[in-house]
Amino acid sequence: GTLSVLGADAARAGSRPDAAVRDATQQYATTGKAPVIERSDSVVYPFGESQPVLQCTPLRACDVELEAGEVVHGVALGDTERWISSPLYSGDPDALVPHVVVKPRDYGITTNMIVTTTRRTYHLNLVAPAKGKTDETDGAYLRRLRFYYPGDVVEQWSDAAQLEATRANRQSEATIASLTGAMNPGRMNFDYSL
């Protein structure tokens, strides 16, 4: 089923399947629209569906977590004078999770960031709110931004469904072929009486 494919991806990534991501991916498969998932510790964006906005404040590090197994090729900041970025990795050596840590040097600034990896290119907007808008409870500080990949998962579901249809078709053809061989008139015995 569809959940087992997503579960296999999550296992490969070294994490448990996430019910909110499963539900959001199901919604994407049905409607073509993938929602942003908001949590207390992070915001999870559907890759390729919108341009994420990461709000960071000076003296705080913000984490952009990418898909396990990706390797960061490069990080480009629009404003390298007032923003700092550092690629990092976490997790098991066989399924490293790439992160890009971002810090603004000042208040009231914005820029963009492009991250290229072995699998995709990420485009993000970075915002450091004006001074005085830095209380973590007002939403001005986002510790962690993550992604889920509904297009990839739906494609895997489609591939799995096609594979299952091909298997069923081959099984049906094999059954017909075995019956056809049994019904070969040249191999039938007509020398009998009642």
Feature-to-residue mapping (PLM):
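A general "mature secreted/periplasmic domain" signal
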Residues: 1-194
